[in-house]
Amino acid sequence: MKTRIIQDEPEPEPEAAAPAGADTPVADERETWLRRAFFATAIVGYFVIGVVHPADIEVGDETALYIGIHLVQPVFILLLAWGIWLLVKDLPGRAAQVARIAIVPYAIVYSMFDAIAGVSLGGIVRQANEASAADAATVQRLMDSGTDYVGIVIFVASGLTWFAMAFAAALAVRRIGGLGPTLLMAIGAAIFAVGHPFPPGPIGIALFGLGIAWLELRREAAKAPEAQPVLAP
């Protein structure tokens, strides 16, 4: 008597699920180009602002350029803040943590104190230019008299918040970019903290931008695959 053995067909193996981080390379690439675009726009913009920025403004001076500079400035401030965030948000270490924390004070202080104060001063000078000669002279005497404590506070607060953020970011990227980019960024940050008009402004932001560019080149080179040896036939 023959026995017929029936074998069940093996069930097809379930398809492997896509890894949770499958979209991560695309997201990383998008963030990379956003970071570069933010830095490029802000650095070039601040360089131009520094070159054309009047050293001082007095009654009788043209105010359109001065006011326009300080109206545009908050855009570059926020782009720098966003660029720094994208640069250090995933980096470990105390310096990266300090840079992340310092972003908000920098954005608030530099925007509200420096940019808004510049617009306000330009508006005062414009009103004085439209007033009588006697009133204009009175405004100028008020601007020249005494110590500008408000201006000193704005200058110090703006410079310190920028330097804290940018210098901490420069230290944080040393482990991925090396000493060269860190030095350029740190020196540029220190010079730019003195002020954004010429000469410290353009020089400082240019050095900081060169450090960022050097860092990006090193990061790009680190991502490039190693060349595979070709076997001779």
Model-predicted regions and their roles:
Residues 8-17, 221-233:
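A short, highly charged, low-complexity intrinsically disordered segment
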Residues 1-30:
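Short, Lys/Arg-rich, polar N-terminal cytosolic tail immediately upstream
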Residues 23-230:
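Hydrophobic, aromatic-enriched alpha-helical segments typical of multi-pass transmembrane helices
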